[in-house]
Regions:
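DPxDG-like acidic metal-binding loop motif
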Residues: 1-20
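Surface "functional belts" at beta-alpha junctions
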Residues: 20-120, 135, 149, 154, ...
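Residue-level signal for inorganic ion chemistry
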Residues: 127
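Flexible, glycine/charged-enriched surface loops at secondary-structure junctions
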Residues: 139-143
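Phosphate-handling substructures
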Residues: 145-147
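Oxyanion-binding "anion nests"
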Residues: 161
Length: 168
Protein backbone atom coordinates (compact mmCIF):
# COMPACT_ATOMS: atom_id res chain seq x y z
CA UNK A 1 0.00 0.00 0.00
CA UNK A 2 2.78 2.42 0.88
CA UNK A 3 4.41 1.86 -2.49
CA UNK A 4 1.09 2.75 -4.13
CA UNK A 5 0.56 5.90 -2.06
CA UNK A 6 4.01 7.33 -2.88
CA UNK A 7 3.60 7.41 -6.67
CA UNK A 8 0.06 8.80 -6.35
CA UNK A 9 1.37 11.61 -4.14
CA UNK A 10 4.26 12.32 -6.52
CA UNK A 11 1.89 12.39 -9.48
CA UNK A 12 -0.48 14.79 -7.69
CA UNK A 13 2.35 17.15 -6.77
CA UNK A 14 3.88 16.98 -10.24
CA UNK A 15 0.53 17.73 -11.88
CA UNK A 16 -0.13 20.68 -9.53
CA UNK A 17 3.37 22.10 -10.07
CA UNK A 18 3.55 21.22 -13.78
CA UNK A 19 6.74 19.21 -13.29
CA UNK A 20 7.89 15.93 -14.87
CA UNK A 21 8.28 12.69 -12.94
CA UNK A 22 11.33 10.46 -12.90
CA UNK A 23 10.45 6.90 -11.97
CA UNK A 24 13.22 5.33 -9.89
CA UNK A 25 12.81 1.55 -9.62
CA UNK A 26 12.72 0.51 -5.95
CA UNK A 27 15.10 -2.43 -6.32
CA UNK A 28 17.55 -0.35 -8.40
CA UNK A 29 17.61 2.30 -5.66
CA UNK A 30 18.29 -0.35 -3.02
CA UNK A 31 21.16 -1.75 -5.10
CA UNK A 32 22.57 1.78 -5.37
CA UNK A 33 23.23 1.64 -1.60
CA UNK A 34 26.27 -0.47 -2.54
CA UNK A 35 27.55 1.85 -5.28
CA UNK A 36 31.13 1.00 -6.11
CA UNK A 37 30.92 -2.60 -4.88
CA UNK A 38 33.21 -4.86 -6.92
CA UNK A 39 30.94 -7.90 -6.59
CA UNK A 40 27.57 -8.66 -8.12
CA UNK A 41 24.80 -7.04 -6.04
CA UNK A 42 21.46 -8.71 -5.32
CA UNK A 43 18.83 -6.72 -3.42
CA UNK A 44 16.22 -8.90 -1.73
CA UNK A 45 12.92 -7.46 -0.58
CA UNK A 46 10.52 -9.94 1.01
CA UNK A 47 7.51 -10.33 -1.29
CA UNK A 48 6.02 -13.09 0.89
CA UNK A 49 5.10 -16.59 -0.28
CA UNK A 50 8.81 -17.53 -0.75
CA UNK A 51 9.18 -14.75 -3.32
CA UNK A 52 11.46 -11.75 -3.43
CA UNK A 53 11.49 -8.45 -5.25
CA UNK A 54 14.98 -8.59 -6.63
CA UNK A 55 17.38 -7.94 -9.49
CA UNK A 56 21.09 -8.29 -10.25
CA UNK A 57 23.54 -5.41 -10.62
CA UNK A 58 27.22 -4.61 -11.00
CA UNK A 59 29.15 -1.37 -10.85
CA UNK A 60 31.85 -0.55 -13.37
CA UNK A 61 33.38 2.64 -14.73
CA UNK A 62 31.44 4.63 -12.14
CA UNK A 63 28.07 3.38 -13.35
CA UNK A 64 25.52 0.84 -12.22
CA UNK A 65 24.87 -1.92 -14.76
CA UNK A 66 21.59 -3.84 -14.59
CA UNK A 67 22.13 -7.54 -15.26
CA UNK A 68 18.58 -8.59 -14.31
CA UNK A 69 15.93 -5.83 -14.08
CA UNK A 70 13.81 -5.69 -10.95
CA UNK A 71 11.30 -8.52 -10.79
CA UNK A 72 9.24 -10.62 -8.40
CA UNK A 73 10.49 -14.22 -8.43
CA UNK A 74 10.80 -17.22 -6.17
CA UNK A 75 13.94 -17.29 -4.03
CA UNK A 76 14.82 -20.57 -5.75
CA UNK A 77 14.79 -18.86 -9.15
CA UNK A 78 17.08 -15.97 -8.21
CA UNK A 79 19.40 -18.39 -6.39
CA UNK A 80 19.64 -20.52 -9.55
CA UNK A 81 20.46 -17.42 -11.66
CA UNK A 82 23.20 -16.42 -9.24
CA UNK A 83 24.66 -19.93 -9.23
CA UNK A 84 24.60 -19.91 -13.06
CA UNK A 85 26.44 -16.58 -13.10
CA UNK A 86 29.30 -18.04 -11.06
CA UNK A 87 29.92 -14.57 -9.57
CA UNK A 88 30.51 -13.63 -5.95
CA UNK A 89 27.35 -11.85 -4.80
CA UNK A 90 26.50 -9.38 -2.06
CA UNK A 91 22.93 -9.48 -0.75
CA UNK A 92 21.11 -6.61 0.91
CA UNK A 93 17.57 -5.69 1.87
CA UNK A 94 14.86 -6.72 4.29
CA UNK A 95 14.70 -10.10 2.56
CA UNK A 96 18.17 -11.10 3.74
CA UNK A 97 17.12 -12.31 7.19
CA UNK A 98 14.05 -13.99 5.66
CA UNK A 99 16.02 -15.94 3.05
CA UNK A 100 19.46 -16.25 4.72
CA UNK A 101 19.08 -19.91 5.67
CA UNK A 102 17.88 -20.86 2.18
CA UNK A 103 20.78 -18.96 0.58
CA UNK A 104 23.35 -20.54 2.89
CA UNK A 105 22.09 -24.01 1.97
CA UNK A 106 21.71 -23.47 -1.79
CA UNK A 107 24.30 -20.99 -3.03
CA UNK A 108 27.26 -22.48 -4.87
CA UNK A 109 29.13 -19.19 -5.28
CA UNK A 110 30.93 -17.03 -2.72
CA UNK A 111 28.55 -14.54 -1.10
CA UNK A 112 28.27 -11.88 1.58
CA UNK A 113 25.38 -10.26 3.41
CA UNK A 114 25.71 -6.47 3.48
CA UNK A 115 25.86 -4.78 6.88
CA UNK A 116 22.47 -3.96 8.43
CA UNK A 117 22.81 -0.21 7.78
CA UNK A 118 22.75 -0.91 4.02
CA UNK A 119 19.48 -2.87 4.09
CA UNK A 120 17.02 0.04 4.00
CA UNK A 121 16.13 2.42 1.20
CA UNK A 122 18.11 5.64 1.38
CA UNK A 123 16.61 8.89 0.15
CA UNK A 124 20.06 9.98 -1.04
CA UNK A 125 20.38 6.92 -3.30
CA UNK A 126 16.89 7.48 -4.74
CA UNK A 127 17.75 11.15 -5.38
CA UNK A 128 21.12 10.46 -7.02
CA UNK A 129 19.71 7.68 -9.19
CA UNK A 130 16.76 9.93 -10.06
CA UNK A 131 19.18 12.65 -11.15
CA UNK A 132 21.06 10.19 -13.36
CA UNK A 133 17.82 8.98 -14.96
CA UNK A 134 16.68 12.59 -15.48
CA UNK A 135 19.93 13.47 -17.27
CA UNK A 136 19.43 10.36 -19.43
CA UNK A 137 16.10 11.82 -20.56
CA UNK A 138 13.96 9.36 -18.62
CA UNK A 139 11.60 11.95 -17.14
CA UNK A 140 7.96 11.67 -18.16
CA UNK A 141 4.91 13.88 -18.16
CA UNK A 142 3.10 13.55 -14.84
CA UNK A 143 -0.26 12.89 -16.53
CA UNK A 144 1.22 9.94 -18.45
CA UNK A 145 3.05 8.43 -15.45
CA UNK A 146 2.05 4.90 -14.46
CA UNK A 147 3.97 3.16 -11.67
CA UNK A 148 5.68 -0.12 -12.55
CA UNK A 149 4.24 -2.58 -10.04
CA UNK A 150 6.04 -5.91 -10.06
CA UNK A 151 2.90 -7.84 -9.20
CA UNK A 152 -0.78 -7.19 -8.62
CA UNK A 153 -2.00 -5.97 -5.24
CA UNK A 154 -3.83 -8.44 -3.03
CA UNK A 155 -7.15 -6.70 -3.81
CA UNK A 156 -6.47 -7.00 -7.57
CA UNK A 157 -5.54 -10.68 -7.22
CA UNK A 158 -8.71 -11.38 -5.21
CA UNK A 159 -10.86 -9.51 -7.76
CA UNK A 160 -9.35 -11.56 -10.60
CA UNK A 161 -9.92 -14.76 -8.64
CA UNK A 162 -13.59 -13.86 -8.04
CA UNK A 163 -14.04 -13.00 -11.71
CA UNK A 164 -12.45 -16.32 -12.70
CA UNK A 165 -14.70 -18.22 -10.26
CA UNK A 166 -17.75 -16.38 -11.60
CA UNK A 167 -16.98 -17.42 -15.19
CA UNK A 168 -16.71 -21.12 -14.32
Amino acid sequence: TGLRIGPATAKGLALALDKPIVSVPTVDALAYNLWGCEDQVCPLMDARRQQAYTGLYTFSDGQMQTLLPQCAVGIDEITAKINESGKKTVFLGDGVPVFADYLKENLQVPYLFAPAHCNKQRAACVAVLGGILYRQGKAEDAAAHKPDYLRLSQAERERQEKARDFRI
